[in-house]
């Protein structure tokens, strides 16, 4: 979870569920590490790296160095929802105990896709009754295979803005379609302070 300046308001960290928090880490500047660890949050020190494009590239490279073949990169201000049932497009807020279902599903989809996303809440009803769609834009939630992206020479830091869209489009161009889960959603509650 790339973050900066949101010391007291880690919405995504609080939303991902206890199982995910065992594996998750905030990717933050050196000066924020002590505060977050005192709050029980694991951290990765990104040093002086600034700009979400550069931070995403740092995360990809760090994951490869650590031997992670699959990772999920999340914006730091997300809450999650899911369909109430398979009969209607209506959504409900998720609870902590069920969030592992989403992460396990994303991991499973990564077995056959280089990148997996999650539908935003806005306009989500247009996807009903599908549960997964392919070849869609994705943002805020990025499950990726770092080695494949690196092997293709695709870098987040190539673009100053819209780097997530750039990487998605470059993967499409390279023949790697994505899978986007559409019966679960992300939404941005919003928080004060700098992002990423």
Predicted region positions:
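C-terminal catalytic/acceptor-binding lobe
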Residues: 159-161, 165-196
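Short, well-formed alpha-helical segments that are part of the catalytic scaffolds
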Residues: 1-20, 32-37
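A structural signal for short, well-ordered beta-strand segments and their strand-loop junctions
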Residues: 70-75, 114-119, 178-182
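Active-site-proximal specificity loops/subdomain of glycosyltransferases
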Residues: 19-74, 79-91
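A short acidic (Asp/Glu
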Residues: 10-12, 36-37, 82-86, 126-132, ...
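Short beta-strand/turn micro-motifs composed of small residues
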Residues: 1-3, 28, 117, 182
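Conserved catalytic core of nucleotide-sugar-dependent glycosyltransferases
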Residues: 81-165, 173
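Short, solvent-exposed loop/turn segments at secondary-structure junctions
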Residues: 6-7, 51, 77-79, 121-124, ...
């Amino acid at each position: 979870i790339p973050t900066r300046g949101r010391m007291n308001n880690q919405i995504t960290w609080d939303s991902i569920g206890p199982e995910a928090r065992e594996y998750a880490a905030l990717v933050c500047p050196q000066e924020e590490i002590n505060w977050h660890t005192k709050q029980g949050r694991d951290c990765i020190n990104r040093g002086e790296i600034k700009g979400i494009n550069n931070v995403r590239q740092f995360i990809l490279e760090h994951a490869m160095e650590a031997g992670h073949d699959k990772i999920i990169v999340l914006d730091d201000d997300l809450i999650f929802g899911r369909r109430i049932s398979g009969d209607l497009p209506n959504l409900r807020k998720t609870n902590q105990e069920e969030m592992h279902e989403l992460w396990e599903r994303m991991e499973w989809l990564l077995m056959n896709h280089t990148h997996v996303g999650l539908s935003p809440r806005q306009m989500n009803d247009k996807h009903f009754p599908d549960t997964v769609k392919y070849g869609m834009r994705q943002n805020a939630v990025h499950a990726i295979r770092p080695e494949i992206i690196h092997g293709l020479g695709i870098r987040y830091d190539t673009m100053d803005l819209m780097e997530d869209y750039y990487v998605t489009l470059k993967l499409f161009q390279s023949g790697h379609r994505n899978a986007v889960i559409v019966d679960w959603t992300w939404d941005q509650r919003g928080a004060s302070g700098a992002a990423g």
